[in-house]
Every structure is written in C-alpha cells, then in structure tokens.
C-alpha cells in the first residue's frame, strides 16, 4: 500500500446523503476475481445520467470526493473502496461515514476524512463557485485546504498511522515476522503443524 502524507487534487461535490455501498458499486459489478478494474462500476446507476457530477468536466478528473453525511453505509463491501480508488480518488470527505466503510478505506489506502457538515457545505460552495478547485489534504496536520480555507478533519490515530506508514494488513503482520518465526521455532514437535508445500 502506498503511504499517504499529503494529497492535492480536484474537488468533486457529491451532494447526496446516505450513499450506501450498493450505490457506490452495484452488486452486478462484483464478479471479478481481481482487486482492480472496478472503476466502471463506480456510481454506475447515477453515471447513466449525463448531468451526474462525474460526467462533467473538470470533475471527471477529480481525486478528492466531498460527499454528504453517512457515506459508505450498508453492507461490508471492500469493492466500494476499490472502485473509488480505481477511478482515481485518494480522499473522501464527509461529515459521517459508515463504520465498516471507514475501516475498509484505511486498510486499502483511501483517506476517509471526517469534517463537520458546515465544513462540507463550505467546500461544496467553493468547488461549485470555482470548478477545478484543487483541495489539499494533509494527513500529518489533519487538515483540508481549499484556497484560503483551512478545515480540520478527524481520523483515529491508528488508521492515520497506518496510512502515513503505508501499512496494509499484510505489511502489519510482516512487522511481527521475527516474533512469528520465534513462536514457530519454539512450537512443540509433537503438536500438529502446517507445512509449506514444495
């Protein structure tokens, strides 16, 4: 997973609340056996509308999604995070996230930045007044910068640390490799073992 420190990209105003994971990527797009290639399913039912924000320039090149409250609710669907990332998003800003979505985002390298709803409304206004406005999100300082506006965001310390270090679940496990190997070496010979295949 790529480490996340600071990201600057075009802001995309998604003026919708209660966006669940089925709206982010419908189930029909979940048949892949790989972890990439889900961008075509992102907001698929909404993208059929030519006036949908991701069909409009410059928002079609955005990488900072500014969404309404309760983004990513519903079923645990890692594909929702993967679809956002495959499309090019590195950050989603909202006043509230679904708990499972927030966890999946942090594990995959997508920053879910929680900003007060007044801050979200201000970002929408700024983006719509200046389409193509670049937003900078600084994880170290935990702030969002849009023009002269600086807004704090919330994220739990553990997820922030994982993102800053670029640690997915496998990388976290490998940090304990010495302890794992020591445990395996001390494991009694008379107990069952799982042996590597050759």
Swiss-Prot record:
Spans through the membrane: none
CDD domains linked to this entry: IPMI_Swivel
GO BP of this protein: L-leucine biosynthetic process
Entry-linked Pfam families: Aconitase_C
Pathways involved: Amino-acid biosynthesis; L-leucine biosynthesis; L-leucine from 3-methyl-2-oxobutanoate: step 2/4
UniProt KW keywords: Amino-acid biosynthesis, Branched-chain amino acid biosynthesis, Leucine biosynthesis, Lyase
Substrates-to-products reaction catalysed: (2R,3S)-3-isopropylmalate = (2S)-2-isopropylmalate
Signal peptide: none
Enzyme Commission no: 4.2.1.33
UniProt xrefs under InterPro entries: 3-IsopropMal_deHydase_ssu, Aconitase/3IPM_dehydase_swvl, AconitaseA/IPMdHydase_ssu_swvl, IPMI_Swivel, LeuD
Molecular function GO terms recorded: 3-isopropylmalate dehydratase activity
SUPFAM superfamilies for this protein: LeuD/IlvD-like
UniProt-listed NCBIfam families: leuD, PRK01641.1
Biological role stated in the UniProt entry: Catalyzes the isomerization between 2-isopropylmalate and 3-isopropylmalate, via the formation of 2-isopropylmaleate.
Protein family per UniProt: Belongs to the LeuD family. LeuD type 1 subfamily.
Subunit comment: Heterodimer of LeuC and LeuD.
Name recorded for this polypeptide: 3-isopropylmalate dehydratase small subunit
Organism (species): Mycobacterium marinum (strain ATCC BAA-535 / M)
